[in-house]
Amino acid sequence: FFPNAPVRNEEMEDYIGLVNPKSSIAKRLVLEKNGIRSRYYALDKSGRVTHTNVEMAALAVRHLLAEAAMTPAEIDLLACGTASPEQLMPSHGVMVHGALGGDGGAEVVSFAGSCCTGMHALKYAWLSMRAGDAQRAVCVASERLSAWMQARYFEREAELIDQLMEKPILAFEK
């Protein structure tokens, strides 16, 4: 599941804004080197969040279950991974399980904290099936970083850098 329409490189700042109101100095170089041409934001152009991370994960699972002609109650194991949960507790996996209706006695596990959380979830699901602990495991990895990358969160830092450029002695003050 991808939220909204793809956002091209040229449109990024229409969604996340400008800092101090300047375009990013590193943007062109980073995008040129990483080869990414578009991405999906869970934001509209006004910066309003359109989907939570939990909603995106639950929608992805619902699409999978629809293709498999299954219901959430038929899942034995739900393994979720994210580096960008909306909250620490309850865990991301428990929140996704709840968004799916929380039916059945599915085991729910959450992996969080780094870029490899999706692989951890996949490995856990695979090993659980190999061990016979689960017959129908679903693994989902989701991220929603777009809301954290909005310009408004970087304005204060930009102001401090401007002050430092005007008065370099500030770097040595305690």
Model-assigned labels for residue ranges:
Residues 33, 79, 139:
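Short glycine/serine/threonine-biased micro-segments
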Residues 76-84:
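Short glycine-rich or small-residue beta-strand-to-loop segments that form or flank ligand, phosphate
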